[in-house]
């Protein structure tokens, strides 16, 4: 078993302040003995409106937030999985379809990155959110260009990670595609053992669906599911549900953090910059998949 940590913050428009929150969590994770720390979606910033979000976005390679987390990972010897915003620079990456599409549309990318314990980032492990969130007054599509591909599961100290982000949670096809064995040609026969959903759920959708959906994804994929969440009020217009959670392949909650206390988005005492620890047992993944094989009838319905 390997010890992992999950942390939650309350991002604002202050990138410097958000980095400071995250760096403190990296230190807590290291002192607790964790090998990997999972942080929420949009950890770099949550702006007050669409234009402000576009104005704050920079390229991942020059982001002071990302550079600061790389240094924190290296200093503390802890790998970090985190959600950020990325402004494409097409001249530097002419072959990246997501970058080209986003630039043409004047939009940015909602991205999950993995920073190794030595501070390095392997771009092949980067994932751009496929399903953007348009609900109520929130219109993510106004600023975010959807990604166009899944990222192959990649190795980490806590197993092979399959990256997804927040609203992707409502589309089980994505998690099934990452985690089910399938033909040898899929992921070279190396499906995900742990799925991530860095998130910033609204209060209404969080109360109704958050834990139910996450446990369902864990049960149907027979994988670990880790969802680090934003918590509390970011600005007068927006608040997040919190309750970061890790679920084992049998659907049992391994750790659950605090959340909001009321309809105004007030965070429980200690919820902001809270961290939780859990042991990732990859033998449990193998055992559950072996004892309850999910033999899909693709002769009757289409394979995902």
Question: What are the functions of these language-model segments?
Answer:
Residues 8-15:
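Short polar catalytic/cofactor-binding loops
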Residues 224, 230-304:
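C-terminal beta-strand edge segments of enzyme domains
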Residues 1-5:
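Extreme N-terminal starter segment of soluble prokaryotic enzymes
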Residues 82-84, 110-114, 152-154, 244-246, ...:
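Short beta-strand scaffold segments in enzyme catalytic cores
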Residues 58-60, 71, 88-190, 198, ...:
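Active-site catalytic loop in hydrolytic enzyme cores
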